[in-house]
Amino acid sequence: VHLTAEEKSAVTTLWGKVNVDEVGGEALGRLLVVYPWTQRFFDSFGDLSTPDAVMNNPKVKAHGKKVLGAFSDGLTHLDNLKGTFAQLSELHCDKLHVDPENFRLLGNVLVCVLAHHFGKEFTPQVQAAYQKVVAGVATALAHKYH
């Protein structure tokens, strides 16, 4: 991902304020509510029958935290996202058979959640930088797909 020095600073400054546990669970939960077909990858998570059930599901929260932990790692390797996410790409492609479009959807949901949490601090410039990052991460995660 090519970011200007200003964009990198905007991304890392805001990310330093993110509660990964909270935002991760909320982002994954919103993905599952807004795009219900994505729930098929989470059969083992128990009750996903209503928006409240999804948003309060401890397994959704735990996996969201894990997902955002990987995203955090990616932020420290913006110049090598494909390498950083190679193993996760392989896992999601070969073993889990996740539609790579879902990575793009989750990235966009994450941007919405950040906007919700940070309000005026999440300026159009910050959003533009984050859109570049989530697009780069989605592309890296889709890299192993044939």
Curated annotation (Swiss-Prot):
Domain Globin residue range list: 2-146
Pfam families according to UniProt: Globin
GO biological process terms, semicolon-separated: hydrogen peroxide catabolic process
Positions carrying Phosphothreonine: 12
Top-rank taxon, per record: Eukaryota
GO CC term, one of those recorded: haptoglobin-hemoglobin complex
GO MF terms held by the record: haptoglobin binding; heme binding; hemoglobin alpha binding; metal ion binding; organic acid binding; oxygen binding; oxygen carrier activity; peroxidase activity
CDD domains (UniProt xref): Hb-beta-like
Residues modified as S-nitrosocysteine: 93
Residues where Phosphoserine is found: 44
UniProt: heme b binding residues: 63, 92
Positions of modified residues (N6-acetyllysine): 59, 82, 144
Listed InterPro entries: Globin, Globin-like_sf, Globin/Proto, Hemoglobin_b, Hemoglobin_oxygen_transport
Positions carrying N-acetylvaline: 1
Gene3D superfamilies named in the record: Globins
Alphabetized UniProt keyword annotations: Acetylation, Heme, Iron, Metal-binding, Oxygen transport, Phosphoprotein, S-nitrosylation, Transport
Expression across tissues: Red blood cells.
Regions that span the bilayer: none
Family according to the record: Belongs to the globin family.
Subunit structure: Heterotetramer of two alpha chains and two beta chains.
Name the UniProt record assigns to this protein: Hemoglobin subunit beta
